Every structure is written in C-alpha cells, then in structure tokens.
Amino acid sequence: MQSLSLGQTSISKGLNYLTIMAPGNLWHMRNNFLFGSRCWMTRFSAENIFKSVSFRLFGVKCHNTDSEPLKNEDLLKNLLTMGVDIDMARKRQPGVFHRMITNEQDLKMFLLSKGASKEVIASIISRYPRAITRTPENLSKRWDLWRKIVTSDLEIVNILERSPESFFRSNNNLNLENNIKFLYSVGLTRKCLCRLLTNAPRTFSNSLDLNKQMVEFLQAAGLSLGHNDPADFVRKIIFKNPFILIQSTKRVKANIEFLRSTFNLNSEELLVLICGPGAEILDLSNDYARRSYANIKEKLFSLGCTEEEVQKFVLSYPDVIFLAEKKFNDKIDCLMEENISISQIIENPRVLDSSISTLKSRIKELVNAGCNLSTLNITLLSWSKKRYEAKLKKLSRFA
C-alpha cells in the first residue's frame, strides 16, 4: 500500500474532524461517528482515504487566494451576478458569507419594486451585506414604517444609497414603530423626524427607554434655564442637532456646563446659545471641546487678542470648536501670511469654513483682480463657488 505523497493526514477524535492538508488547499470534513475522544497521527493510502470518505467541497475563494473561503457557493454566484463587490462585502461583514440561508434575490426584487436601480442595489449590498439576511416580510413592514416619516419611495431609496446601515442595521420593527410614535408624541414634526432619519438613523435603533431618557433630560434642562415650554425647547435642540439623541445624557450635561462656565453665561444667555448655533457642540466629546477651545485661546492670545475677543470669536461661530487643532492653526497662519489681519478674521470667522487650498486660490485671484485684502470684506472667501465667482467677475471688471 503506497503512502499518501501529497501531504499528511491527521484524524482528530476530539473534534470529530478529518483534515487533509495538501500544498494548495485545506479541506475540513466532518465524520460524526467513526472517532473517539483524543487524536493520533497515522498514515493512510490515498486510495483508502478517498474510498472511505465521501465529502462535498464547499470552499470557494474570490480574488484573494489567501483569504478565508466563502461557505455558500450559491450566494457567491448570486452576488457576483448582481454586481456586488465581494471583497468589500467580506471585509465589512464576513459573517454573512457563512450563512446557508440568505435572501439576496428577495431583497433585489423588493428594492427594484421601490425604484432602486441594479447598480444602487449592488452598492447597498457591497457596503452593508447584512441587508441580504432580512426577510421580505421584515423589509415590507420596515418600509411601511419609514413611509410614516418619508414622503416617497424614491426618497427612501436615496437615503439607502447614502447610508444602507440606516435601514438594515436593525430588524426590530416593533422598536422602530414605538420610537416613531414616541417622537411624534413629544411634538417633533414629520420634517424633524425625516432629518433624524437622514442624519442620525441610529436614533430609531435606540431602545425606547434611551430616547425617553434624553428627551426627559432636555425638558428638565430647558426648565432649569428658564424656558417656559419644555417641548418647544426639545424640538429646537433636536432640530438644530439631530445627533443629540444618540449621545449620552452625561455628555450633553457636561457640554452645557462647559459652555456656561467657559463663557460666564447666565441662564438666559446660555439658553439662547444652545437653542441656536451652540446646539451642535452638545454632542461633542467634552474633552475634545475643552482641548479645542484651549488651543483657540492659546493661538489667538499669541496674536495679541484679548480674552473678550476670543470669547466673542467663538460665541459668534461655535463651529470653530469642531476644527482640529492643527487645521485651525494652519488656517489662521495661511490668512495672516496673505496680509489679512487677525481682527478681520475675528470679525469674519466663517472664512475658516473654507479649506486651505480654497483660501489660497481665492486670495490669489482677488489679488490678481486688484483687490486690497487689508480693506476687503473677507467673508467672500467662504462663499459658495457660484456666488464667489460672480463677485470675482464684478471685481475684475472694475480693476
């Protein structure tokens, strides 16, 4: 009897597996009744091995020969036919490919019936492959619930194209339905819920209790600051900052205190700030907000600004706190290198909305048009492209 020359064969009694190791492949076959509780090594002939064991080869590889084999050949074929990026899908949610039952064809037909193109469907599955695990009944129910917020099927398709996770992350339709009812009950409008669904869909995957906790916290915060209509306060905060319901009450409370203490605001001033431009700061990491403000303060102090000027600058444009320290410093330096004074920046903080490359190119164009940057209203540096180019054309005409 000749020994198996391609590799070695081991019989594992404890795991009930027969493993055949050859140069290019690793095959696993289960034998549930032949072996005991420990394992030993022995030699078999190739003839005996393949006579005694019947098996189905189910490992299929795609593109990358070093990656883990896919388990479901039919699934792989279906997804490839649909134009799905298999490598992307496997990297994002590899567990989906180990399922023996999936609903990719049902998902395809469902989304086609709602107006999605084949390309959009392929993109959705590539980026969020767990979508193919949802049943037709679950999809239909969830879609109907979304239509209580979103006005058309096409609008839902557009949301799914941007963020497939928003629709497919959870299959708990009862929780979704309860959250929708609750958010309507506290006075949020359909427009506000649509904004939540588009920007912060995880709000609807939260447990109902979690959303109730945040709403109750905000109502109490509004009352403590002197707002006489807690429901109106909640509506304003959520509309200004749709991400707030997916943050902890601890974080929001810390940021309210940060704004109060840092800028020495009384209740009325704080109320105006957080119902307006300061609302967006409430969901920031409190440590990040403090570090960012400390950096802004240090940079502006180094350029001769007073404490009052720094506070005026940040309060007039709270979004500046979102800028990373290096990005903020680099933008300030870029503007000052072009003979724009710090007082001009303080008066027109929204110029920091633009990227450094946009600032440099626009400054160059304005100089070429004969503009004196030291006397120019620099707000046009942050205008939309269309509006800026129209203004530049007028300035060039009079140069």
Curated annotation (Swiss-Prot):
UniProt GO cellular component terms: mitochondrial matrix; mitochondrial nucleoid; mitochondrion
InterPro entries associated with the record: MTERF, MTERF_sf
Entry superkingdom: Eukaryota
Result for mutant: residue 202 to A: Strongly reduces affinity for DNA. Strongly reduces transcription termination
Tagged with keyword Cell wall biogenesis/degradation: no
Transit peptide as recorded in UniProt: 1-57
Impact when changing residue 288 to A: Reduces affinity for cognate DNA
UniProt site positions, description: Interaction with DNA: 162, 202, 243, 288, 350
A GO term, aspect molecular function: double-stranded DNA binding
Subcellular location: Mitochondrion
Chief site of localization: mitochondrion
Biological process terms in GO annotation: DNA geometric change; DNA-templated transcription termination; regulation of DNA-templated transcription; termination of mitochondrial transcription
UniProt keyword list: DNA-binding, Mitochondrion, Phosphoprotein, Repeat, Transcription, Transcription regulation, Transcription termination, Transit peptide
Residue ranges, annotated region (Interaction with DNA): 169-170, 247-251, 324-331, 355-358, 384-391
Mod. after translation: Phosphoprotein with mostly four phosphate groups. While the DNA-binding activity is unaffected by the phosphorylation state, only the phosphorylated form of the protein is active for termination activity. Functioning seems to be regulated by phosphorylation.
Free-text function comment from the UniProt entry: Transcription termination factor. Binds to a 28 bp region within the tRNA(Leu(uur)) gene at a position immediately adjacent to and downstream of the 16S rRNA gene; this region comprises a tridecamer sequence critical for directing accurate termination. Binds DNA along the major grove and promotes DNA bending and partial unwinding. Promotes base flipping. Transcription termination activity appears to be polarized with highest specificity for transcripts initiated on the light strand.
Description of its domains: Contains nine structural repeats of about 35 residues, where each repeat contains three helices. The repeats form a left-handed superhelical assembly with a solenoid structure that wraps itself around DNA.
Family: Belongs to the mTERF family.
Assembly and interaction partners: Monomer.
Name by which UniProt lists this protein: Transcription termination factor 1, mitochondrial
Gene expressing this chain: MTERF1
